[in-house]
Amino acid sequence: MLKIIPYDHILPFDLFTDDFPIKIDLVYANPDHPENVFGKVYHPQARLSGHIDLLKVTLLAAMRLYTQQGWTLVLKDCLRPVEAQTRMIETPLVQANPHWLEEPRFLSNPGGGGHPRGMAIDVAAQDHRAQHIDFGTAFDHFSSETDAQHNPAHRLFPQMSDAVRSNRAILGPRPINAI
């Protein structure tokens, strides 16, 4: 059973947008957002929040990414309440792709995974001209296939371009190195 996270361990990221190179683009708060494949998940006034430990690592990683690459970290999703996960799983898209709920999972069952505890974050990045950095797929890419050979979001996808491979290599270790 997962441990319940105390409310005071969850903080909204928007408290830090003036002091850190982060931008918030809470995709699932806008059913018309071009990257939102699930429709209405959060209410329009939702705030992107996360566990204080993840928040610290994310902000430090954003500083390193900005200092070393000139990139701004774009935060797409983090704390996802059980009700929101349930709404995602009940969408026709997920119902048509039940394998997304099997290992390796694209989506966790309601209450499972890091999102309901604010311990998972979905990100993208922009360069100093606010241009999107190409990582090969949208931040939440749901392929019909989960294996590396057929899923462009997979870390070992063999057909990714050198630029995408390089961008992923730059972003990948930043959170770990921020600890």
Question: Model-predicted segments: where are they?
Answer:
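Extracytoplasmic cell-surface/polysaccharide-interacting catalytic and binding patches
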Residues: 1-78, 86-179
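Segments that shape or occlude catalytic/ligand-binding pockets
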Residues: 81
